Amino acid sequence: MSKILIAPDVHGRKFWHKAKEMIDSVDKVVFLGDYLDPYPLEHISRLDAIKEFEEIIKFKNDNPDKVVLLLGNHDCAYCFDFGSASRYDYENESEIKALFSTNIRLFRLYFREGNYLFTHAGVTRDWLRTYLPEYDIERFTTLTTRELVPFLWNVSYLRGGDNNTGSIVWSDVREGDREDTYYQIFGHTQLESKPIITDKWACLDVRKCFLLDIDTGKIEDIC
């Protein structure tokens, strides 16, 4: 495998359509989660966001081995009933929960390919030490979604919570001490215009798709 297309937080936007255009020229497509709950200032209706989500589910079903759908904090709020994220869609809650429930087998919380680890918000050492003290990063990547659910709603003060660090769906990019056994790729923290790409991790939540070349390690935007 050499090229992975990455679609960060969608929130009802259409930029992910680039993945449909390029599906035959990449080896894998990884969505980083957060498909719904659009931002009001972007003038995307909640119903339009649901339609985009339905298209993404169809895209996954049409390309089951090539498309990876990760769960974000907004998605987990509908999937696991442990609280609501900002802009939670109470009006269409039943429909959204049914979509997730019917298709939950299509989603996961992390994806690893070689030396690259994809999650919605990234893995910090503090989170592993505090909430999964018996697990290092290698053992973490053996855990199932069901096993990880109890530890997802850890939110730090940077996101309005009272935990010392956020989970893999809640960690803010400002939370340091990133686990660096694998090169981490995540979204969650919306950035103004440019991604943050370091030699240890990349935060790509800038409303566009990216292409990762596994052979060279280069990450570039393609939208």
Regions found by a protein language model. Name each.
Residues M1-L5, F111-L117, T198-D199:
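Beta-strand-turn-beta hairpins that frame and shape the catalytic cleft
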Residues M1-S2, D24-D27, P64-K66, G114, ...:
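A general structural motif
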Residues I6-P8, V29-D34, V68-N73, F118-T119, ...:
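Active-site neighborhood of phospho(di)ester-bond hydrolases with catalytic His/Asp-centered motifs
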Residues A7, G12-L99:
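Core catalytic region of metal-dependent phosphoesterases/phosphodiesterases
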Residues G12-W16, D37-Y39, H74-F80, R125-D126, ...:
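Active-site environment of divalent metal-dependent phosphoester hydrolases
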Residues Y90-E91, E95, R108-R178:
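Active-site-proximal loop/helix segment associated with metal-binding centers of metalloenzymes
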Residues E93-R105, K200-L204:
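Short, solvent-exposed secondary-structure boundary motifs
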Residues S167-I222:
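Conserved beta-sheet core of the metallophosphoesterase superfamily
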